[in-house]
Structures are given as structure tokens and as C-alpha cells.
């Protein structure tokens, strides 16, 4: 019957490459099992890879949140030295091995294993937002006088560029060591696990300012990604993020965000690690919102990933939204309705056409997380 499939594709001029596209479940619906709302049969029916008995961590998929002793200044708390150049590598690796043993247990674990370390970024310049603290303290390590001068005149671009260049020499080498030594250790003891870091590669396309949005990753970020090739060569499973925002973004812009990032993932894989498998994270909510993705946006996101030769996707969700029976039922209805429709549609050859850059906002009423209380 294969020839019929390919004939159909040729006649209608559509893309029908029979590539595997696997959906993984990284949503803590094990909490719902305790509330008598089971997702197990539904996920199995939809061919979404999940762990046995609905467990959050298990034989198919495990995420490890900052295992070890990563230097961090998250939440305004300085822990484990705060910055990579102040961390203790020996203690970190000892704790990392212990934490992974407790989480995976089985030395022969062969599922996806995601290390989620979001305390800082190895490219010094990319530490923005709350991470700006790493810049400020490293500036002071380099030269307190110049750091103070810049603090009093942040419009001095020449001084800023000098501080970033010199401070990167202090920060980036130990940051690289922490990332590389960590993957080397876990790959040594858990050889069959499919290791990777969450978040990488970064792109930073389609910025917040509407007049400065571009589908492509900024040129400087591409250059920085090229210099970070050591990271992309060190593990073969990539877990970047394609979360989309609704407020102040058109549906076309949301699609451009996903497509621009997929283009960069393709480029980096081709140049630095052709055997890498890429499973971008997709959140079923709009970023910074309690609104579910519309059918159109969920379909757009997954279709761009599939047509962009990604190997699949990881569906993510937060535990804080699944603490009550009614919240679990609400998500179940979304998966059984909207997500089912989208996933079944992706299997049809006639739907395997590349996103053309245009779309129409859904006319359906917005659907939000249910603000509910269980039986009193």
C-alpha cells in the first residue's frame, strides 16, 4: 500500500515524508490519579508517550530539576556560590550523581532524561532580565571602579561592551565546565538514557517590542550559538522551548516565533550534530496566561514542528494547575477535545503542508483554566 500513499502525495503536491513524530507527556497528571481523574487510557489512545501508571517520572520520561549543586542567584538567594566562577565543581558532581541515582534508580534507564537548569545561561551576554545580577557582580569582579561608573551611566555603550567582553572571560569558562562535566558524568553512569538540557538552543526571536520583531533569531544570537557548538555536540537530545504568547501578538506572529526557532534548530543540528533528536517543549497554555491554546494555535505549533523535521514534541504543564478534581477534569476535557482533534488531524496526509505564514484568529470563545472549588 506504500505506493498508493506516495502516489496520493505526488498527485496533490503535498509533503508526505514518513518521518516519526513522537509526542511526550511532561504534565504532572499523576496528581489527578489521586483525585480519581485518570489520563492513562486517554494518553495511550492518543499515542502520547507517558510513564507507567501515570507517574511523573518513569521509564519513558524523567525531568530532573537542578540536580546537583548548581551555583544560582534565583529568587534573590545566593546558593552554591551564586555564580559559576564561585561554585564547587567537586561537591556539585558528587551531589549530581546522588540526585540522579535517587531519581532514575535503574542504571539501565533508557528513556528521555531532561536536566532543567535555568539558573543562568552559559553565554554571559544572554543573562538578561532577573539574570542581570550575574552581569553586575561579574562586572565588579573584573573592575569595581568601572562597574560603578557604568551603574551611574548605563547609556555608555562603549563601557558596557568592554565590561561584557572582559567579564565573559571570567564567567563563561566555568559555566562551560559545569555544563560539560555534568553531562559527561550522567552519560558515563547512565549510558542508555537519552540525556539533554532543557531550553537549549536559545533564539530570542520575536521580542516583546512590536516594532522590533523578526522571525529570524538575531544575528548576534546565531553567532553565540555557533560559539556554543561544544554544548550542542555534547548530547544528542535537545529540548528547546516554543511557548507562545497571545497578548499583543497576532496569530501570524505566534507562528513566526515557532518557525523562526525551528529554522535555527535545523541549522544548528545540520552544522554541529546531525544525529541530534529535537523535541521542543510545547505548553498547552499561552505564556503568561491561564488561557488554553486555541485549536488553531496548537495545530500551528505542532504542524510547524513536524514539517520542520523535528522528531516530536514534549507537552508541558504545571503542577500548580492540577491540585483539584475540577482542574483535572478541565484539562482532561481539553486533551480529549481540542488536543485529540489536532493530533488526529496531524496524521492525515492532506494536512502535511507547510505553514504559509498566514492565519486567522479563532472565532471560538477563549477557554481559560477553570477557576473552581471542589465539593465543600
UniProtKB/Swiss-Prot annotation:
Short name of one Pfam family: Glyco_hydro_56
InterPro entries: Aldolase_TIM, Glycoside_hydrolase_SF, Hyaluronidase
Record-listed E.C. numbers: 3.2.1.35
Biological-process GO terms, alphabetical: carbohydrate metabolic process; hyaluronan catabolic process
Tissue: Female salivary gland (at protein level).
pH dependence remark: Optimum pH is 6.0.
Post-translation changes: Glycosylated; glycosylation is critical for enzymatic activity.
Sites where a glycan is attached: 36, 55, 77, 88, 143, 153, 181, 214, 226, 248, 287, 321, 336, 356, 371
UniProt GO MF annotations: hyalurononglucosaminidase activity
Reaction(s) catalysed by this chain's protein: Random hydrolysis of (1->4)-linkages between N-acetyl-beta-D-glucosamine and D-glucuronate residues in hyaluronate
Disulphide-bonded residues: 32-328, 203-217
Family (UniProt): Belongs to the glycosyl hydrolase 56 family.
Note: Enhances dermonecrotic lesions caused by venom serine protease from Crotalus oreganus helleri (hemorrhagic factor). Immunization against the protein protects mice against L.major infection; protective immunity is abrogated in B-cell-deficient mice indicating that antibodies against the proteins play a significant role for disease protection.
Function: Hydrolyzes high molecular weight hyaluronic acid to produce small oligosaccharides. Up-regulates expression of CSF2, CSF3, LIF, CXCL1, CXCL2 and CXCL8 in cultured human dermal microvascular endothelial cells. Promotes host neutrophil recruitment at the injection site.
Name of the featured protein: Salivary hyaluronidase
Amino acid at each position: 500500500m506504500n505506493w498508493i500513499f506516495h502516489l496520493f502525495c505526488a498527485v496533490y503536491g503535498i509533503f508526505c515524508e514518513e518521518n516519526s513524530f513522537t509526542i511526550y507527556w511532561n504534565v504532572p497528571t499523576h496528581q489527578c490519579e489521586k483525585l480519581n481523574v485518570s489520563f492513562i487510557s486517554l494518553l495511550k489512545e492518543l499515542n502520547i508517550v507517558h510513564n507507567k501508571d501515570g507517574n511523573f517520572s518513569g521509564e519513558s520520561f524523567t525531568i530532573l530539576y537542578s540536580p546537583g549543586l548548581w551555583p544560582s542567584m534565583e529568587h534573590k538567594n545566593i546558593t552554591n556560590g551564586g555564580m559559576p566562577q564561585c561554585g564547587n565543581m567537586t561537591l556539585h558532581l558528587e551531589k549530581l550523581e546522588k540526585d540522579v541515582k535517587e531519581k532514575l534508580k535503574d542504571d539501565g534507564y533508557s528513556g528521555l532524561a531532561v536536566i532543567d537548569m535555568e539558573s543562568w545561561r552559559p553565554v554571559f551576554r544572554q543573562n538578561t532580565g532577573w539574570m542581570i545580577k550575574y552581569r553586575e557582580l561579574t562586572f565588579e569582579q573584573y573592575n569595581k571602579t568601572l562597574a560603578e561608573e557604568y551603574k551611574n551611566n548605563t547609556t555608555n555603550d562603549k563601557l558596557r561592551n568592554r565590561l561584557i567582553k572582559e567579564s565573559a572571560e571570567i564567567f563563561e569558562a566555568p559555566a562551560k565546565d559545569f555544563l560539560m562535566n555534568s553531562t559527561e558524568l550522567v552519560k558515563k553512569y547512565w549510558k542508555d538514557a537519552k540525556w539533554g538540557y532543557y531550553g537549549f538552543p536559545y533564539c530570542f526571536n520575536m521580542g516583546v517590542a512590536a516594532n522590533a520583531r523578526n522571525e529570524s533569531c538575531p544575528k548576534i544570537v546565531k553567532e553565540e550559538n555557533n560559539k556554543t557548538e561544544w554544548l550542542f555536540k555534547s548530547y544528542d537530545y535537545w529540548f528547546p522551548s516554543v511557548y507562545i504568547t497571545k497578548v499583543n501578538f497576532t496569530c501570524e506572529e505566534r507562528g513566526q516565533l515557532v518557525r523562526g526557532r525551528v529554522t535555527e534548530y535545523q541549522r544548528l543540528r545540520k552544522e554541529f550534530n546531525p544525529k541530534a533528536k529535537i523535541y521542543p517543549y510545547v505548553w498547552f497554555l499561552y505564556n503568561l496566561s491561564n488561557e488554553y491554546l486555541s485549536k488553531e494555535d496548537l495545530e500551528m505549533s505542532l504542524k510547524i514542528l513536524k514539517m520542520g523535521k523535528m522528531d516530536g514534541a514534549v507537552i508541558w504543564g504545571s503542577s500548580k494547575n492540577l491540585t483539584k478534581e475540577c482542574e483535572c477534569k478541565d484539562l482532561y476535557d481539553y486533551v480529549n477535545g481540542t488536543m485529540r482533534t489536532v493530533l488526529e488531524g496531524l496524521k492525515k496526509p492532506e494536512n502535511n503542508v507547510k505553514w504559509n505564514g498566514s492565519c486567522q484568529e479563532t472565532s471560538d470563545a477563549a477557554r481559560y483554566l477553570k477557576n473552581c472549588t471542589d465539593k465543600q
